[in-house]
Amino acid sequence: MMSCLVPTRFTLTLNTACLLTSTWGFVRATSVVLPPSLSKAGHKQFLTIISIIATIINNAVNISNYYIQRNNKMNLETKKKSDFISRHVTLPVSLVLESIVATVYWPLRLFFVNLIMHGVESTAKTPFPMTVDMAIHLYPILYLLADHYLSGSGTKFKLSNKHAWLIVTSLAFSYFQYLAFLIDAGQGQAYPYPFLDVNEPYKSIIFVVVATITWAYYVFYQKFPPKYIKKSAKKGDKN
């Protein structure tokens, strides 16, 4: 029976740093006063907030896994479960979420800010400073990529592309229904991002496109796993 890959100190450092910056960014971002059209649904409607919560959970789980794998009193089954949850559930989920957040957010933030923020026509008038912007929209994906590819703890994810597609599709549909439940256009409420304030079928098409790109990120990460995993596979083929 194969033993679990013991997380490196670099993984611990990355997850601790990400936990601190993400939590700080989350607190600062959720303290921003929303305009009337968004205030009723609150900050919980934003994909950025949902993603940063997933990242914070992933950080906490991976920090715990670091110590679990080094605890001689823990049995192998507990270590295997901890490894699976931290490296093959919370990490890929937060990684693909932060990937799509960064992909959608930054091009619009830099060139079409009116499509990503309500009532903002200039990048100089955003509701929070660049430090907060980076903490919730850029640093998370950089930390997660470093943990997966550079920390020495990364492996190819165990979830198949087919199962990943089912999960991503379910999450996208759930978010679509979640927003429909929170937002009542008849009462002057608006979707969290202006580019979603369109009629059907365009709104659904946007969700399908975003969900497809999110799944494509998972496929990409599986196609190009951490390098040392590839080397190990090649050695195994020769034997």
UniProtKB/Swiss-Prot annotation:
The keyword Transmembrane applies. Disulfide bonds: none annotated. The chain crosses the membrane at residues 12-31, 46-66, 100-120, 126-146, 163-183, 205-225. It holds the Pfam family Far-17a_AIG1. Residues 32-45, 121-125, 184-204 are lumenal. Belongs to the UPF0641 family. This is UPF0641 membrane protein YHR140W. It comes from Saccharomyces cerevisiae (strain ATCC 204508 / S288c) (Baker's yeast).
